[in-house]
Amino acid sequence: MSGSPVKRQRMESALDQLKQFTTVVADTGDFNAIDEYKPQDATTNPSLILAAAQMPAYQELVEEALAYGKRLGGSQEEQVTNAVDKLFVLFGAEILKKIPGRVSTEVDARLSFDRDAMVARARRLIELYKEAGVSKDRVLIKLASTWEGIQAGKELEEQHGIHCNMTLLFSFAQAVACAEAGVTLISPFVGRILDWHVANTDQKSYEPLEDPGVKSVTKIYNYYKKFGYKTIVMGASFRNTGEIKALAGCDFLTISPQLLGELLKDTSKLVPMLSAKAAQASPLEKVHLDEKAFRWLHNEDRMAVEKLSDGIRKFAADAVKLERMLTERMFSTENGK
């Protein structure tokens, strides 16, 4: 019998091992899929909410959001906008019942180049959370990492005490600007960087440590730790568990339920690949970026320019689809409501 604890330890899942050196976050709007993985936090985005809003299990939330939009009145457009904001918050509030940490809720990607509009929309979302009995300490507002988005994040953090998660982050320039803005958390993307390299270069597969997305997040993590930035680095957008394992030790990693499931079944040994101590030895030098320098440095990275604009377009398109779906249900005469 004495050998059993050792055996049990050896059979520990990769997910449980990962949790020893990284905060695990669930990347989904489908909160019924969260329970078995016991994540600390959760992240949502317009695409994930759109997918969840079409599932039968969540129709009560959709109905509640529609009723809220109608109750507030105004033009058709205003009613739909209010219903969308309410829907995002309803999903977030339900997710928070299942996790001990924070949920990330995204500001409409169509506002990505309008600093003031992003600030106003973020404050509105926090107000809706407050009405739902959720403190702003449990919410991260997601903003696209454009120059305007990063400055909106700085303003929200400094003037309103609202925590921000800077998303669609593909370039080192974006990461430096976010660090200087003092935002709570960044979401550098991994899988979408890999996608770009597979589509635009001759190399079609990569070992995890050579994966360009993994290398990007590793560089950003090392830079933040070497120069003492408090901003949390949360790797996001994974295509396989190899990428996740190659970033073990990163502050946070946000992972889809499908890949969380694969990690739960995986019993191979996991070792931390990133550490604040090792980061001190990295050869990176400190950089300061004003707006002009940021725009130039970001523009020099073709992959990042293309993936940021592509990401904004995709999230905006899904926001339009969600609005269309809610508009049909709110105002179609066939609905009978």
From Swiss-Prot:
Organism (species): Sus scrofa (Pig)
Catalyzed reactions per annotation: D-sedoheptulose 7-phosphate + D-glyceraldehyde 3-phosphate = D-erythrose 4-phosphate + beta-D-fructose 6-phosphate
EC number: 2.2.1.2
N6-acetyllysine found at: K219, K269, K286, K321
Alphabetical list of HAMAP family matching this protein: Transaldolase_1
Catalytic residues, chain numbering: K142 (schiff-base intermediate with substrate)
Domain of life: Eukaryota
Family: Belongs to the transaldolase family. Type 1 subfamily.
Major site of localization recorded for this protein: nucleus
InterPro entries cross-referenced by the UniProt entry: Aldolase_TIM, TAL/FSA, Transaldolase_1, Transaldolase_AS
Name of the protein in its database record: Transaldolase
